[in-house]
Amino acid sequence: MGATKKNLSRRSFIGTSVAIAAGLSLAGGKLWGAPAYIPNLLSPNFTINGVQLGVITYSFREMENQSAEAILQYTLDCGITSIELMGSTAESFNGRPENKMDRRKFYMLSRKARKNKLTKDQEKELADLKNQQTSYDKEIEAWGKNRSLDGFTKLRKMYNDAGVQIYAFKPDYLLSKKNSDANIVYAMKAGKLLGASHVTLELPRDTAHTLRLGKMAEKNDIHVAYHGHEQQNPTWWDSALSQSPNNAMNIDLGHYVAAGNEAPLQILKDKHQHILSMHVKDRQNPGNGKNNMPFGKGDTPIVEALQLMRDEKYTFAATIEYEYKTPENSTIIDEIKKSIAYCKDALES
């Protein structure tokens, strides 16, 4: 491979990537409006020159329909076949009752209450929302006593039949410190049934809890990969990694750059054996504002990181996470396609 190609700047990929994205749209055109979940339509385990490229389904959070079926269709529409699946999607498919409380309003009123800025009508509204949440908590507690794992097996089959593999599972609250061992085991078993090699969550501050999770992961034959935001630094995961071989890393390269870490590629070189998946987004460094940007326009070395993974044959997945604001003349799906094309171009250059 010529040095000229290897040393292309990140921004030089943008024009080529847009063209590739257009190609993906044309190639994937049959998916739009077509019957969903056509078996073997796409190849599972989407890899480019040895690098597994996926998307976290959090990227679809602003889409109106959040059902497992809709999330699958969005994935297919993007032309991707490997995902990190959000827990709420899987649990809803498995029969978890829906929380119909207006959570946005609840959080907004709760913030105002802490500042003593509620009107009398708002005080009544917040009290009603709290009562709704209490009733829902009781409903969930009752459901949890008799819940089954069958839905996760069915969900995996539906996704696999469409050519989509779930390599990571983010079970939200289920892995938190306050949860029972039964809930944690449930989350880990769900991950296994979905086909995931690891479950993900934010790295807890409590080392006793990371020890607990690591030991439970050993018993359930799965790994726990810890995610981070701007708390990330080169030694941030060290305690958890030392506690169990089943504790691992779900590093976020964009947040790592936004945190001001000066050598983002070095941590990949030093700890690749502990990384099971890496979130890929393009954030600016602190000096430039830390904003989420379209791929190629921020300060995150996406091209260099992907090519490092390819050249050194690192085995962890690169998970695209869509977080920047959708342009008025575009859609979430189209922007994710552009991000995929940008990564594809990097890996093929």
Question: Can you name each region flagged by the protein language model?
Answer:
Residues 154-165, 194, 308-315, 346-349:
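A structural motif corresponding to the C-terminal end of an alpha-helix
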Residues 86-89, 172:
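Short beta-to-alpha linker loops that shape the active-site pocket of alpha/beta-hydrolase fold enzymes
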Residues 88-96, 100, 115-116, 146-166:
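Active-site anion-binding loops
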Residues 2-24, 29-81, 90-110, 114, ...:
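Histidine-acidic metal/acid-base catalytic patches
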Residues 59-60, 143-144, 175-176, 201-202, ...:
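A generic structural signal for short
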Residues 17-30, 45, 145, 151-152, ...:
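Active-site acidic/histidine proton-transfer and metal-coordination neighborhood
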Residues 120-160:
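Intrinsically disordered, low-complexity acidic Ser/Thr-rich regulatory segments
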